[in-house]
A protein has these predicted regions:
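Structured, basic alpha/beta domains of bacterial-type, RNA-associated proteins
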Residues: 1-23, 27-124
Length: 124
């Protein structure tokens, strides 16, 4: 892993966040940023900032790094702690509302250089 970035306590449920994270996992950084920029999901803007942060971390770590070779190697979404709210209902009852949150982690890595096909594999 070249660089990582974490976004904790994001105020969107992990289920909704995973829908957008699945779009960028395994893509190059340029493709992932374009996908997030034109996504209509609300969480895409936060994930775009997170990806920009991971990219800045990679450039800070190695200034000579070729940014075009970076890919989203790992992207995980975990449940965060829910905020508990109450809603008044009839006959003096209270229903609990859970405002869910999530933790997002992104790791960038360099794509390996494509090796030439082996001679033995070519003979088969």
């Amino acid at each position: 892993m070249i660089a990582t970035a974490r976004l904790k306590y994001l105020g969107v449920s992990a289920q909704k966040t995973r829908l957008v994270v699945d779009l960028v996992r395994g893509k190059s950084v340029g493709e992932a940023l374009a996908s997030l920029r034109y996504s209509r999901k609300m969480v895409a803007k936060d994930l775009e900032k997170l990806l920009q942060s991971a990219l800045a971390n990679a450039q800070q770590k190695d200034p000579k790094l070729d940014v075009d070779r970076l890919v989203v190697a790992r992207a995980t979404v975990d449940d965060g702690p829910p905020q508990k709210r109450a809603r008044a209902r009839s006959m003096g009852r209270i229903y609990r509302i859970l405002k869910r949150s999530s933790h997002v982690s992104i790791a960038l890595d360099v794509t390996p250089a494509k090796a030439a096909p082996r001679a033995a594999a070519a003979k088969r």
